[in-house]
Structure formats: C-alpha cells, structure tokens
C-alpha cells in the first residue's frame, strides 16, 4: 500500500488508503507544513500499513469526512453532474468554512444548531468555491434562503447517519 505526497497551497498533504476492520476502504488526507514532515509521515504510514500495525485515525474532520462521503454517494446513487456540483457547493461554501476543521468525534448537536444559526444570517455567495468573498452592503442584505438551509440540513443528516454506520 502506497502513500502519496501532494503540494496543496502552502502545505504538503499525504494521501493514502486504508481499510477498516470490515474491509471497507477509505481515502485519508493529512496535511503538514513542510515536505520533510510529510515525507516522514509517508514512510511511517507505509511501514505501518505493510506491518499491519496501522491504527485507524479517529481524528477525521468534518471536511475530510464529507469530501470522502460525497464521491461515494455520487457513484452509489448515480447522481447527475449537476446534483454532485450542488452538493459539493453546499459542502465547500456552507459547511467547511464554518465546521470543516472540527473533528467528527467532537461534533455535538449544539455545533450543528450554531451552524444553522450562523447560516441563517449569512449572505448568499459569502463563499464561492470554498473561498470567502467581499460583498457589497447590498449583497450582504441577501441572506441564504430557507430552502438552502434545508438542503444543508438534509446533507448533514444523510452523511452523519453514514458516519455512525462507519463508526466515526
């Protein structure tokens, strides 16, 4: 089993695939500020995977989990490209900027409530392609619709049900 290093912006990511106790495969990304740290981690992962001593990371973040979940859902339900894109946009623009760095294990219902509360006051188009935009005072008055908030709710509900199944 191999691990790969990718430069992402100012950091280096180690990408690898591991299997849980049920033989299910997961892709995992871990980020490091330097190439040296990433290289050391890559060697460690490959050694552990080969030796069978690899411990399944329980530090999966909301962002990592959702970006792992999305393509799997897409192929499972044979989504149209448009469905995939709209779900990706929800994740990148309305979820990751707010709770993406949180560990799944530490996420509690009140974090989700706080997210909905924040989103209900968030202007449309505050994030596009996962990047924050400067909005004019007029644009800032247009908040997200109830429909959009409901879509975020559905997506989180469906994906988190799966997280329970996956034992995250």
Label the predicted regions.
Residues 20-22, 36, 74, 123:
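Residues that cap or initiate secondary-structure elements
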Residues 49-60:
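Intrinsic-disorder/low-complexity linker and hinge segments
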Residues 1, 163-168:
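Short, intrinsically disordered, charge-balanced linker/junction segments flanking boundaries
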Residues 33-49:
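A short, charged, amphipathic alpha-helix used as a generic interaction element across diverse proteins
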Residues 1-33:
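Short, Arg/Lys-rich segments that mark the N-terminal edge of DNA/RNA- and chromatin-recognition modules
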Residues 58-164:
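Short, Lys/Arg-enriched alpha-helical recognition elements, typified by the DNA-recognition helix
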């Amino acid at each position: 089993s191999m691990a790969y290093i990718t430069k992402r912006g100012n950091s280096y990511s180690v990408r690898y695939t591991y299997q849980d106790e049920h033989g299910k495969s997961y892709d995992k990304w871990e980020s490091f500020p330097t190439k040296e740290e990433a290289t050391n981690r890559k060697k460690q992962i490959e050694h552990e995977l080969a030796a069978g001593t690899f411990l399944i990371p329980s530090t999966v973040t909301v962002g990592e989990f959702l970006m792992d979940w999305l393509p799997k859902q897409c192929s499972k339900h044979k989504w149209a490209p448009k469905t995939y894109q709209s779900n990706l946009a929800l994740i990148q623009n309305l979820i990751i900027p707010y709770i993406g760095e949180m560990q799944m294990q530490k996420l509690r219902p009140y974090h989700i409530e706080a997210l909905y509360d924040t989103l209900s006051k968030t202007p449309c188009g505050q994030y596009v392609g996962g990047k924050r935009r400067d909005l004019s005072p007029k644009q800032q008055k247009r908040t997200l619709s109830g429909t959009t908030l409901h879509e975020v709710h559905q997506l989180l509900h469906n994906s988190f049900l799966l997280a329970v199944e996956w034992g995250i």
